[in-house]
């Protein structure tokens, strides 16, 4: 019986970040499909774990030890990339044309030896390919949501919003650039409100009461879950070219059309992961 280990720095019961929320859906679906799927925080993974499992899905791995990373390179694993952990600072946006010097690239062999490096969008994948010269990069072109969240977004599509209002995400993370989004709204005398950090369903219900999302990140967003959520709720978006989602063909969709598309894409993403790491899934 094949055994699979899912590795991540944090899980959704610890941090409600976009990567963790995506991983929670992926992990749940893998457990519905495969016989044995366990999960461990990256800092707890030991060399003995590398021998105890047959397959590995590595999400965020900042806290994974060098010994374990080196050992995994002889194993069957994929990297489910949420940012750019081959860079010292994980941010290609600090370099001209997103091109770092060779001295700032780390973990290269860990990416080279993976069966696949799954990226969130074509934009994300192009940056990774350009910087690492890999031929194992796969663009997923989407994200994963639980059905409950899709249902809430469907509900918010029907919400009567009235006058034009602008949403700004209140984030303590500097590169999310809340301050510039506020300045943009105030300079144009737009009616805006701050959407505060909160649990996902409440966040969606709050965000969905506005007509437009203003999101102006300073760094490349591999996809931007919140921008896609806004589009799925029928909202307009004011963003920058740093958003991975806006470069996808499906970004012209919005509302129920985009929700239906993302539901289908979610199934395709999960199937893609299974096909690549398990070939035809667990036999």
What are these regions (language model features)?
Residues 1-64, 238-283:
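N-terminal pre-catalytic "stem/leader" segment of glycosyltransferase-like enzymes
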Residues 31, 49-55, 65-78, 90-92, ...:
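Glycosyltransferases and closely related glycan-assembly transferases
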Residues 55-58, 72-101, 118:
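Active-site proximal beta-strand in glycosyltransferases
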Residues 96-117, 126, 208:
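Membrane-proximal helix-turn-helix segments that form the acceptor-binding/catalytic region
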Residues 112-137, 177:
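A short, active-site helix/loop in glycosyltransferases that binds the activated sugar's phosphate group
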Residues 144-206:
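Conserved catalytic-core segment of nucleotide-activated headgroup transferases in glycan assembly
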Residues 208-210, 229-236, 240:
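Conserved donor-binding/catalytic loop of nucleotide-activated donor transferases
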Residues 215-227, 232, 242, 246-248:
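Nucleotide-sugar-dependent
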